[in-house]
């Protein structure tokens, strides 16, 4: 199977796979119903100013959960957390939880709405970081 091949499975009951196994090496996005699972990407920071981490359409998604890993590349420090974002069309609400630090928090997070776009931003504690971001978004 190549990257451009499409496999569609439609079933009214449970589906199981035994042989051959399926290995998915790289999938940027999977949508099941109104839930989208996405690799947002990797961002590099070089200052302590607020940085855009992600943006999504508020007419498509009501909420999102992020898994975020921040690596301070200068001091070899690490920060891993989950972030939940919810909006009512006018205001974005955000909370960080399940946070682990090798020393201290490396980034604070915020969210805002402009028009029909919800922006998630991060403000680094130290200037040189690599940020890896994964998102699960739930439809309106």
Report residues per predicted region:
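Surface-exposed ligand/attachment interfaces on beta-rich extracellular proteins
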Residues: 35-63, 71-77, 118, 125
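Low-complexity intrinsically disordered segments
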Residues: 95-140
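Extracellular attachment/recognition segments
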Residues: 72-112
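Short amphipathic beta-strand/extended segments with alternating polar/hydrophobic composition
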Residues: 18-19, 78-86, 132-135
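A broadly conserved detector of short glycine/acidic/proline-rich loop/turn motifs that flank catalytic sites
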Residues: 21, 28, 70-72, 124, ...
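Short, low-complexity N-terminal tether/leader segments at secretion or assembly junctions of large
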Residues: 1-33
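Short linear motifs in intrinsically disordered
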Residues: 20, 24, 54-59, 107-112
